[in-house]
Amino acid sequence: DGYWSQYKSDVAAARGIDETNFDETLEGLLSKFEAAGGDFAQYALQNNWVDALKTREEVRLELVELVGEDDNELGVNLTSFNSYLKVINPPMPVIESDMDKVAIVVAKGTILDGNQKAGTIGGDSTARLLRKARLNDKVKAVVLQIDSPGGSAFASEVIRQEVLQLQQAGKPVIASMSTYAASGGYWIAASTDKIIASPSTITGSIGVFGMFMTYENSLDYLGIHSDGVGSTELAGFSAVRPLAPEFGQILQRNVENTYGNFLSLVSQARGMTVEEVDSVAQGRVWLGADAIDLGLVDQLGTVDDAVVAAAEMAELEKYDTFYVKRTLTAQEIFWKEFFGQAMTVVGKWQFAHADSALVNEFKRVLREVSVVSKLNDPKGTYVLCLPCDIK
């Protein structure tokens, strides 16, 4: 409800309409839709959701009036999106300055154990980036930019320990929450010196679950069975056989212990009692605007605000900022250049071969299955917000 209210407020302000414009009952919608002659475009125009209804050629001619003609296929003096991004967000200069620095470490994706590539957060690989910032004498403060629904509890703690190491080295760490910083995403943010979120950030989800997937029923349906002998009841447990009740008890006890640790670390970091943390925990999610009142977030703002806060905490008057990135291998550099040049062709092909609704739904299911299949916590214990998916 909070996210929906934020959405209505933003769109209403941008379009100059009343928020009640969105609170349409089914009866009211049918009445307006009938008045629009069953035309969705007319319905949108009458509700002031769009400014005009035009054909592509009419839009093209209007663009020509605005920016002039060109010899490209559209006949309009346009700038490609990639070129636009390069202008407004140019690559950071390679030349090193002698100024003190605020380092930005990006943690985006599901948190997994070990070393992971961009798009996921590796416990070891992200910890290495934080360590790199700690060992750089020019870095005086760090912003940890988080966009994650969580993941492995073990990997989350590996990252949090590096945050503590930075603080022990006298370098303040500010957490900047993006779309998500839930569950494991909050775990790695909790111990930072200050937490800054956007009003619509989904955070909290302080909870733990354990998972060990077995497939004996599916295999039984196919007539496939497995058996064996072991030195104890817990020896040789397998995904192709039912989970032993004793192992289930061990997993449950570990989940309870991890949840207790989660409550404890948040309690210590946020200056709250364990009972106060538990009252807003238990897996519940909160918007950034609500999280401030609950004591889970310190300030509303952007990553730029986080950089300013980090510089102030480090008492820096003049400073540079830079993103700490892992060093690419020669093979990765080659493929990056190759795919960078191929993106224009691929982009046009994808637009011309847009997926059907059925294919898109199939891809959505595959994405959800993929998240589960990649989970690799060594103890099968996860701090992951599975329902954190905004539509």
List where the protein language model places each region.
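C-terminal intrinsically disordered, low-complexity extensions immediately downstream
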Residues: 305-337
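Cleft-lining beta-strand/loop regions that shape enzyme active-site pockets
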Residues: 11, 93-218
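Extracytoplasmic
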Residues: 6, 17, 47, 98-102, ...
